[in-house]
């Protein structure tokens, strides 16, 4: 029996990626050209990762892999409110300064993460009940943190995870005290603090075009933009379960319809890290003109917040997985051409037999 084209493609891909994995050195770079460079060659701005002082000073393979493979960095924790302003008016930038210095020294684009978030929030903020006080506190925090790195950060996640699963605003100190006006306050303050930075709203579970949460995000962002709120981009965290990559294209297209200049995949990890899922997400960004880049949320599985799900591109020994080698292809057309050629060879062999 002659196999169908799907079987041929699968067989060819296995052959192709197995060959790549065996041919590359198991060191900082697993290919002659970084995956960031390949992504940029397709017109995108970056393919990045995360870092902080702890991970950079842990396994030495982590900074080596970052330097060789990724073009952008986000701080995992060092720019969050509890790290930068643990006590009111007392700012601490030791961790974030370390992160920024590493990124700048190694020529990495920086995404700031995150300014206003209900989690990792000091109790002195979450206990505020007065509108004027909370407004002043928000403005001071956003302004101080952003000016610390003015001109150094490409984009900021200004507000993070502000929606419930049904698409309504999450209950938080910000929404309770200020209503949805906290979004306007945050973005207007951020624009004033660094007019050149791209300003993002960022959230998780924006992974299906038909989900209530995604639709709530789109409708709110459209409304806020129409009202003059300076939102430049929507970030989809994209923490996926196994097999969920196929919906990424529709989800990114739906987010792009909100009217922002940009969209981005900001915290990518996928349970099981299958090559199919990673390729689906990469191609979803490549196919959406407004998608500027992808940030993978961690280098190797031991450092992941989902370590037991093995969701990243590098395994527990810091070796590249098949998904890394697949991501090297980046272009769907490139991948199709390669496995079609191999498929034709297989067909010819089968017919000759």
Swiss-Prot record:
Name of the encoding gene: Xyn
SUPFAM superfamilies hit by this protein: (Trans)glycosidases
Signal peptide (residue range): 1-23
GO cellular component, one term: extracellular region
Function summary: Cold active endo-1,4-beta-xylanase involved in the hydrolysis of xylan, a major structural heterogeneous polysaccharide found in plant biomass representing the second most abundant polysaccharide in the biosphere, after cellulose.
Protein name: Endo-1,4-beta-xylanase
Catalytic activity: Endohydrolysis of (1->4)-beta-D-xylosidic linkages in xylans
Domain of life: Eukaryota
Domain named GH10: residues: 50-330
Consequence of changing residue 274 to T: In strain: A3969.2
Subcellular location: Secreted
Record PROSITE patterns: GH10_1 (PS00591), GH10_2 (PS51760)
InterPro entries named among the record's database cross-references: GH10, GH10_AS, GH10_dom, Glycoside_hydrolase_SF
Transmembrane segments: none
Similarity field: Belongs to the glycosyl hydrolase 10 (cellulase F) family.
EC primary class: hydrolase
Carbohydrate-modified residues: 4, 325
Entry's Gene Ontology BP terms: xylan catabolic process
Keywords: Carbohydrate metabolism, Disulfide bond, Glycoprotein, Glycosidase, Hydrolase, Polysaccharide degradation, Secreted, Signal, Xylan degradation
Species in which this protein is naturally found: Penicillium chrysogenum
Main location class: secreted
Disulphide bonds in the chain: 285-291
Pathway assigned in UniProt: Glycan degradation; xylan degradation
UniProt-annotated catalytic positions: 161, 267
pH dependence statement: Optimum pH is 5.5.
One Pfam family named in its UniProt record: Glyco_hydro_10
Temperature dependence: Optimum temperature is 15 degrees Celsius.
């Amino acid at each position: 029996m002659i196999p169908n084209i799907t079987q041929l493609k699968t067989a060819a891909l296995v052959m192709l990626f197995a060959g790549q994995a065996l041919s590359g050195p198991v060191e900082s770079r697993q290919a002659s050209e970084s995956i960031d460079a390949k992504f940029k060659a397709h017109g995108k701005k970056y393919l990045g990762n995360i870092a902080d002082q702890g991970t950079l000073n842990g396994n030495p393979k982590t900074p080596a892999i970052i330097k060789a493979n990724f073009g952008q960095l986000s701080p995992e924790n060092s720019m969050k409110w509890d790290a930068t302003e643990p006590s009111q008016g007392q700012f601490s930038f030791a961790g974030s300064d370390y992160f920024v210095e590493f990124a700048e020294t190694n020529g990495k684009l920086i995404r700031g993460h995150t300014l206003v978030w209900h989690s990792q929030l000091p109790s002195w903020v979450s206990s505020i009940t007065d509108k004027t006080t909370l407004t002043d506190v928000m403005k001071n925090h956003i302004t101080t943190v952003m000016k610390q790195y003015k001109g150094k950060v490409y984009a900021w996640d200004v507000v993070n995870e502000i929606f419930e699963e049904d698409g309504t605003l999450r209950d938080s100190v910000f929404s309770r005290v200020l209503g949805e006006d906290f979004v306007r306050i945050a973005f207007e303050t951020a624009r004033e603090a660094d007019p050149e930075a791209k300003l993002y709203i960022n959230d998780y579970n924006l992974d299906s075009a038909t989900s209530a949460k995604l639709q709530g995000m789109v409708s709110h962002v459209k409304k806020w933009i129409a009202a003059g709120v300076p939102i430049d981009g929507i970030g989809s965290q994209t923490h996926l379960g196994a097999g969920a990559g196929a919906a990424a294209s529709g989800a990114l297209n739906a987010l792009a319809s909100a009217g922002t200049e940009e969209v981005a995949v900001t915290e990518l990890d996928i349970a099981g890290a299958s090559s199919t899922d990673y390729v689906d997400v990469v191609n979803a960004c490549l196919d959406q003109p407004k998608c500027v880049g992808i940030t993978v949320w961690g280098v190797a599985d031991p450092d992941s917040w989902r370590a037991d799900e093995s969701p990243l591109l590098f395994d527990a020994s810091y070796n590249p997985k098949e998904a890394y080698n697949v991501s090297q292809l980046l272009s769907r057309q490139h991948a199709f051409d390669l496995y079609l050629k191999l498929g034709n060879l297989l067909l010819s062999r089968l017919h000759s037999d």
